[in-house]
From Swiss-Prot:
Co-factor requirement: FAD
N-terminal signal peptide: none
EC numbers for this chain: 1.3.1.98
Name of the featured protein: UDP-N-acetylenolpyruvoylglucosamine reductase
The species this protein was found in: Fusobacterium nucleatum subsp. nucleatum (strain ATCC 25586 / DSM 15643 / BCRC 10681 / CIP 101130 / JCM 8532 / KCTC 2640 / LMG 13131 / VPI 4355)
Sequence similarity: Belongs to the MurB family.
UniProt pathway: Cell wall biogenesis; peptidoglycan biosynthesis
FAD-binding PCMH-type domain boundaries: 17-180
Broad enzyme group: oxidoreductase
Gene: murB
Gene3D superfamilies for the chain: 3.30.465.10, UDP-N-acetylenolpyruvoylglucosamine reductase, C-terminal domain, Uridine Diphospho-n-acetylenolpyruvylglucosamine Reductase, domain 2
Entry keyword Cytoplasm: yes
Transmembrane region(s): none
Amino acid sequence: MKIFTNQEMKNYSNMRVGGKAKKLIILEPKEEIIDVYNDKENTDIFILGNGTNILFTDEYMDKIFVCTKKLNKIEDLGKNLVKVETGANLKDLTDFMKDKNYTGIESLFGIPGSIGGLVYMNGGAFGTEIFDKIVSIEVFDENHQIREIKKEDLKVAYRKTEIQDKNWLVLSATFKFDNGFDAARVKEIKELRESKHPLDKPSLGSTFKNPEGDFAARLISECGLKGTIIGNAQIAEKHPNFVLNLGNATFKDIIDILTLVKKSVLEKFGIKLEEEIIIVR
């Protein structure tokens, strides 16, 4: 493992916001996680993947950040089973599926997170969720043991999994794919994302979860908040469920945007929006 102190955590978040951290540990291989938790000096541990949905405070964080981005192996187990380590990203998995002529999660193409992060929150897009093709996951559990859990033994819902409640670390996921890679679907999703999502400035993607039967972006738009700027943070014109860093946004700028959105939507629609991003203070 590699250990760093006083790292600028803005370099580990797609939002490019964040103060310094007490310690950053980069795992490789996965078994090193046992040593991390057995070290009594390591308290207040936070697991970090690719940082695509993490907003860090600007202040010093007295935490131990454990980064899994080097755990990125993708292995074909045969019989259409593929084991993917937590730090692998969807681009690499999609390329692997194309090479093997596998199909099943093409609609997720373009989501910038790690597999571990997507599994943790049951990430999804365009009618597909990551758990649709998962048969089992490998976790580091609350007893500091590495174990495999079958999908049917897990509680999974919209942007929610039992993993969050039990604070497990996802180490890998095993998928069962079908045959017949859908290149046309990948192309369609790529074009949809480019047309609907603001990809030219730092952001964390979808900021709020969609309430049941509705869309956060629609609610925010109906509140007249498209394009709203606070400090150096902006509610995107192109997709109002995205918050953009215009260059030098602070943690407070972004929190003030989130507060404004939640207050406005609650007052106009009586709906309490819930963040899809993770905020680390």
